[in-house]
A protein has these predicted regions:
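Catalytic core of tubulin tyrosine ligase-like
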Residues: 40-42, 51, 62-76, 81
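Active-site nucleotide/adenylate-binding loops and adjacent lid/helix of ATP-dependent enzymes
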Residues: 1-54, 95-98
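Anionic group-transfer/hydrolysis microenvironments
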Residues: 16, 49-50, 60, 116-118, ...
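C-terminal active-site "lid" helix and adjoining low-complexity regulatory extension at the edge
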Residues: 120-172
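A long amphipathic alpha-helix within ATP-dependent nucleotide-binding catalytic cores
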Residues: 78-126, 159-169
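A short secondary-structure junction signal
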Residues: 23-26, 36, 57-58, 70-71, ...
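Protein kinase-like catalytic core scaffold
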Residues: 11, 45, 65-68, 113, ...
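Short beta-strand-to-turn element immediately C-terminal to the catalytic PLP-Schiff-base lysine
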Residues: 25-28, 61-62, 127
Length: 172
């Protein structure tokens, strides 16, 4: 395992518990490192900076199956989060990317989440697994309603002890 001293600038420091890019920092020097670490109150991850900054792919997963992928880009920031003003569009995974997702899904059971990839020299690089990702970005780029998709609702019903009640708007 590398230590923080083993990384050369620039690199990314991010909280293990952050969401929406709020605790993700691009660090160019010792002062920026200290400032970033002072804002992170829990465990953190350090990542080498990929060559294609401001661009990543989120793969939406339900029941350990790929639902859809979305390409996120930003012209103003190294963070491409939709919630921070990044743009989004549907994305078709290539065979290499599908194979990477399947390897991850073989090791982890993802009931509902996202698998994120950044790009280095034009090639997808695994970034992180997000639990309980928001679906607003997905709704903005395609017709899938991830909460009402028949197969998704059926998967939830088949894998949890609770059933729909008066608060459920889906009819099976």
């Amino acid at each position: 395992m590398e230590s923080i001293q083993d990384f050369t600038y620039p690199y990314v420091i991010k909280s293990c518990c952050g969401h929406g890019g709020s605790q993700v920092f691009l660090v160019h020097n010792e002062d920026e490192k200290k400032q970033a670490l002072s804002k992170i109150k829990d465990e953190y991850v350090i990542q080498k900076l990929c060559s294609n900054i401001g661009k990543d792919v989120r793969v939406y997963v339900i029941g350990n199956k790929i639902v859809k992928a979305v390409l996120r880009t930003s012209k103003e920031s190294f963070k491409s989060n939709y919630s921070l003003g990044g743009s989004a569009r549907e994305y078709n995974l290539d065979n290499y990317e599908i194979a990477m997702v399947k390897q991850i899904l073989n090791k982890f059971q993802i009931d509902y989440g996202g698998i994120d990839f950044t790009f280095h020299n034009g090639k997808a690089v695994f970034n992180e697994i997000e639990d309980a990702v928001g679906a607003r970005m997905l709704y903005s780029v395609c017709d899938i309603d991830i909460c009402r998709e028949d197969k998704n609702v059926r998967w939830i019903h088949g894998n949890f002890d609770f059933k729909c009640n008066e608060f459920c708007y889906y009819k099976i």
